[in-house]
Structures are given as structure tokens and as C-alpha cells.
Amino acid sequence: MLGALLLLLIIGAVYIVQVSKIDPPKVADMSALQWQRTDHGNGFYTLKNNWFRHSKSGLYELYVEGEPFERGVVNGKLTAELVVRQEDHFAGQIEKMIPSRFKRGFLKYLIGFFNRNLDKNVTEEYKDEIYGVSESASPAYQYLGSNYARILNYHAAHDIGHAVQNLAMVGCTSFGTWGAMSEDSTMIIGRNFDFYVGDKFAEDKIVAFFNPSTGHKFMTVTWGGFTGAVSGMNDQGLSVTINAAKSSLPTGSATPVSLVTKEILQYAKNINEAIAIARSRKMFVSESFLVASAADNKAVIIEKTPEDLDVYDPKKDFIVCTNHFQSKGLGKTKMNIEQEEQSASSYRYQRMMELLNANGKNSVQKTIRILRDQRGVNNANIGMGNEKAVNQLIAHHSVVFEPKKLLVWVSTSPWQLGEYVAYDLNKVFALKGMNTDREIIDSSLIVPADSFLLTNDYRNFVLFRNMKQRIMDGGTVNTDSLVASNPEFYNSYVLAGDYLYKRKQYAAALKNYEMALTRVIATKQEEDHIRAQIKKIKEK
């Protein structure tokens, strides 16, 4: 019996290894691989009409044009150091999260199984582009798969991460106003992309401008080696941002959400075309696409699950999107009701409605003020870093769009607290190459950094994060100092309680767990953990 089970496991492992092997596409003309970038110094590179630079704002800026494979190759060659560095950061964070080599190996094959048909769900155009970028990937991770297979799989990391962890560190917020709700009636869209894969992963943000051989020109906020889109706007004044919704564990691969978003940006000029593209693609997780269109002068949310699609149109002059569905078709499903009851999404939505109602006529500056808001419902102090806040102090990036004016503001570090710098898509795409290094932001439209950066609270939050990281790394901390650094945050007490419980200091742990219950807790799962720990201590 044991021998038969072992044989079954071996056959299963071989099957997964075989089905997860992904061969690169066959590209007719690969001459772009011979192209070389020109180094002009100070981090400024060019390759034909394409260019890459490091802005004084701290953001990287990239312009790429041409055929799919060429775009990928050029992207990879211009951003080569960032492609390698980003994979290093990603792999390093995975090692931190999963210290066991055996478990990481198992995860590799599990992801391989999920993504066994991934290439069959990606268009030839995007496979060619990803193949081009992958030629600049590091040779150090061949044990995880070929360069092409790895980079392709990374495009599904957002999907698998949010399905496996059920929104852990993927709690985004987006909203928009237009008509009577905006100061000059112009549409304004704001979004926080709260996707956290470690501090280093968020260091090298790229504001990328793409001029593809087919479709529309568009911009995205991205990172090295990633050709998909999570936040972007095209030259038709159509913007797209994505927010994760609750998903069940995927059983097979489909089109990564980021590539569906990119396809909408590249090929849709209005809401109906965006809906048609979203409907045509199979996805293996549930997602909300907030699509704003200058042509339609409104925004809607395309809500999509692996089985269904519905559209939420508020038929008002504003729209709010957190991490639950609102349409008639998908809003009443069992999974969505659970999401509303057990996650931070509904609370954050309620806070957003409060802020909009108190906002008056909206402006870009007011939009950014909302995106930076750390308070809870009724302006409650819920601590710094709470998932129930609009600003959770983990954002990879934050953006504001004015689709009719083709303007976009992008946050600078840290999170959404630094300056928001502005780009005019008309001006950027009119450059037709760049021979000398120069700033492309519109300095007259910069929104200043948040004054919170100058406060003792901010310094205490940095201290809190450092102590939290020390605990995660297995180090020692003073739990009184930990709690004092962020006393209104339930997680301060949970961290202290877990730390003390592990060291068998049960009375002190109990005190912290009980204090946590007096604070605003982000999710039902976390509250259940606290109550379970209290029960275990009392039963000792």
C-alpha cells in the first residue's frame, strides 16, 4: 500500500513538472535581441526611439514602442537591472514568508499545476512581449523554470496570491467623481494599489508609456519585468484600475487579470468595448475593473468571476470600489456576502462614502487628501496601518487620473505620502524619442507631500514597522515599546500577544489579546484568531 502511494506521488510529481513546462512562442524575427542600449550616464538609457530614465522624484520613467517582441526586448534591455532586482526581491520575500525549502518546492509545483495551461490563455501578442522581456531575466533562478516560464508565471502572481491568501495585503480602494460632484465637472479617478510583497519590491516603481504597433497608446504604473497593467490610462481618455474580490482556490489557469487590464487599455476607447474585452477572457479569480471613459463621461465597475460577469453602474456622479461586488447579479452571492461581513471592504466603503459626502465638489487635491486618509468611520482613530482605512500605509502606488485632460498624477515614496507628480500623456507621446535626459513631469501640477511625514506619529509608525519586522525575523522586542508606538492599532496588541504566547508568558499575552478586542479589528479571521488565543490561555 505504501509503495503504491509512493508511486502515485512520484507519477503526480512528474505529471506536474511536465504539464507546468512552458515553451516560449516561435517568433519569426528575433533580430531585436542584437540591439544594444546606449548608456548616457546618470541612469539614462536609449535604444532607437525608446528611452528609460530615473526622475528626481524617485520614479523611473520608460517609453517603449513597436511590435510585440520588439517591445518586450527593448523593455528588458532598458530596464535590465530592475528586471533582475525585482525578481531578487520577489524571491527574497517568498523565502521570508516560506522559510522551508520543502514547502517552497511544493509551492513551485502547486503554482505549476495552477498555471499548467497558462500560455493557452494568453494572446500571441502578449506572449511575444513577455518572451522579449524574459531574455533580460536573471539566470540565477533556472531551478524555478526557464526565464520565459518564470516571467509568464509572475504575471499570474497577483491572481494566485489573492486567491490563496484571500486578500491578504491586496485591499485596494478606488473611486471617481464627475459632473456635479467635481469642481469643473471634469471626471477625476483616484486609486490606492495596496499590493504588498515587501518594502524592497515597492522601491523601483516605473511609470511606463507604451506606443504599440496596434491599438491605442497607454501608460501604466508598473515594475521591472512586468508587462501587465494594474493601473493605467490610454490616449483615448479611458482609465482602468483593478480591485481584488473574494475568490475560491483556482483549479486551473486562465488569463491573468493584469493582461486583461492591459488589453482593455490597448484596445478599448469606451466602456462598451472594455466590457466586450473583459467578457471575452476567462479568469481564474474574481476582480473588479473600475473603468472610466472620457467618451462616455462616466465610470462603471466591471465585476468578473471565473463564471460570470456583471456591470455596476451607479447612475450618479460618483462611484466607489473597494473589495466586494455591488452589481445586482454578483452582489448577492454567498461568497460576496461573506466578503462584506468578514473582510475590511464594507467598512472601508462606508468610510469612503463619509469622505465623499464631506468633500464638497471634488478636485485632484481633494482626491489625494481622501487617498491619504487614515481614519475610520466617524473619524475614529483606528491606528496606523489598519486595513479598514483608505490609506493602509502599504500602497505600492497611488494614482489620480483626469481622463478628459489625459493627465495622471503618480505618488512618490513612501506609499502615498510623498509628492504626487503629474504627467500629460499628450506631451509625453509627442516627444518622439529623447536624446538628452530631462524631466517630463509637469512641475506646475505637483501636489505636495503629506504633512504627516513631519509628525511624531509617522516616526512612531516607522518604529512600529521595524519592530514588527524584527518579530517576523525571529528577533527580540520590548512589547511595551511595540504597543506604545501604535497604541490605537489592534495589530500592535496581537503582535505583542503572539510574541509573548510563543515565549510562554501567558498572563502578559492574555492582557494584550484582551486589549486588541477593544480596538477596531480589520477582519473576522483576525478576530477569530484573537478569541482562539484567549480561549487557549484560559484553558491552561
Annotate each predicted stretch with a short phrase.
Residues A299-C321:
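Extended amphipathic alpha-helical segments with heptad-repeat/coiled-coil character used for oligomerization
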Residues L2-G3, L9-A163, L265-S288, A294-A299, ...:
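C-terminus-biased signal that marks the final domain/tail of proteins
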Residues A245, A294, T305:
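Histidine- and/or cysteine-centered catalytic micro-motif in compact active-site loops
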Residues F195-V197, S247-S248, E307-L309, P414-G418:
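Short, surface-exposed beta-strand-loop junctions and turns on beta-sheet-rich folds
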Residues T220-W223, M233-Q236, V285-S288, E307-P314, ...:
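A general structural signal for short secondary-structure boundary/capping elements
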Residues R150-V260, H396, V400, V408-V410:
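Internal mixed beta-strand/loop scaffold within catalytic domains of large alpha/beta enzymes
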Residues E203-F210, I301-D308, L417-V428:
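Surface-exposed flexible segments
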